[in-house]
Amino acid sequence: YKNIYDGLNLGVNINNKGILNKPFLYGITPIYSVNSNTLTGFVKVKHNTYFEDKNLYNINFGMSVTYSSFAKNAFVTKAVPYINFNFRDATDLRLNQLKSLSLRYVSIEKDFVEVENDKSIAPPYNVFNIRYIDGFNGFKKYHNWFLDAQFSDQFGKLSFNYEIRRRSN
């Protein structure tokens, strides 16, 4: 969400991300908006668990929370808890194949304080999402597909995507 009323946004990204994989990652980004004199930003936490010599090689779970403005004196809070299960062939670690099962819950809530020219009242928006990905990222052959399902109080959605690329000699 971008808001021109905020003017210049000043922020800092504080995290423990590095070159090597860590079991626990965090990121905190407070953002101060000069014109509106507000503090927004986001927080992310993630926990990784790796398994050696198993087809299920990684489980990671975490949560991200974002608080931002979308109009003058109007803010939105987005919270996303998630868990991912990542698979690979434990007998051939050079095989560039990815299989992943992701589950997440997206919750969006808008806070209104008399927004000009906006007649809509947006209720909280909550969606449960499950996605399975299977892909092979080879030099000569590439294929990737996913099956995605989303469920809410008011709708359900099922989607499928398939990508293929072959390199000619």
Predicted regions and their residues:
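Sequence/structural signature of outer-membrane beta-barrel proteins
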Residues: 31-35, 50-52, 66-72, 90, ...
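A short acidic (Asp/Glu
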Residues: 37-41, 74, 157-161
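Active-site-proximal structural scaffolding
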Residues: 7, 76, 153-157
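Outer-membrane beta-barrel initiation region
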Residues: 1-57, 84, 89-97, 104, ...
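Gram-negative (and chloroplast) outer-membrane scaffold detector with strong preference
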Residues: 78-84
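C-terminal outer-membrane beta-barrel translocator/porin domains of Gram-negative envelope proteins
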Residues: 58-71, 84, 129-133, 140-169
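A residue-level signal for beta-strand positions that form part of recognition/binding surfaces
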Residues: 60, 80, 100
